[in-house]
Amino acid sequence: MKSLIDKAIHGDMDSDRHLISIFAMALASRGKVFIELGVREGHTTEPLYEAAKLVGAHLWSVDLNDPTKYKPNNGNYTFVKQDSIKFLEQWPKDKKIDVAFVDDWHSYPHVKRQLEFLDELVGPSSIILMHDLMYGNTDPFYHVDLSHHEGQWASGGPYRAVAELNPQFWEWSTLPWNNGLTILRKKYSNKYHRR
C-alpha cells in the first residue's frame, strides 16, 4: 500500500494519481472477477492485483505486449498476451466481470466495441473504470477532438464512445485529473447478469 500512496503523491506517470482510487473501488466491490484491458508498464495492475488478493478475486490483465515493470507471478493473476477485443469475444458469457479497467487502444471504434462486449459481461453491481477521457492535458475538460482520423485517438477517442451510451441504461462520472478516470456503471438491466 505504501508504494501505491507514494506513486499517487509523487508519481509522474499518466495514471499514478488514480492508483488509490482504483485500489479502493476494486476492494470495495468485493468482486471475484477483475479484468484489466491495457497494461503497459503494469502501474494499474498493482492496485487491481493487491485488491484481488485481499478479496479473493482473480485479475486477468490483457495486452499485446508484456508488462515492462510490474507483473505478479503468483496466484490471483493471469497475464493474457492478446488483443483485448479477441479476449472479450472469448470470455464466457455466463462469467460476470465485477471490475473492468479499460486503458488500451483509445480509438473510438475500438473503445465502442469493447463497451459493446462489456455490456453483456457486467451487471448492475459491476463497475467499468476507463482512463483517458481527458487525455492530452485537456483535464478538467473532456477531450472531444474529432479531427484525428487515424491512430490511437481516431474519431473522438474514448470520450465519444462513452458519451454515446444510452443514459437510460448507463451512468458515469469522471475524476477530472491525470487524464481523467471515468467510473461507468450499467444502471439496472439484468438481461445478462442479475447482480
For every predicted segment, state its role.
Residues 1-101, 105-195:
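A short alpha-helical cap/connector motif
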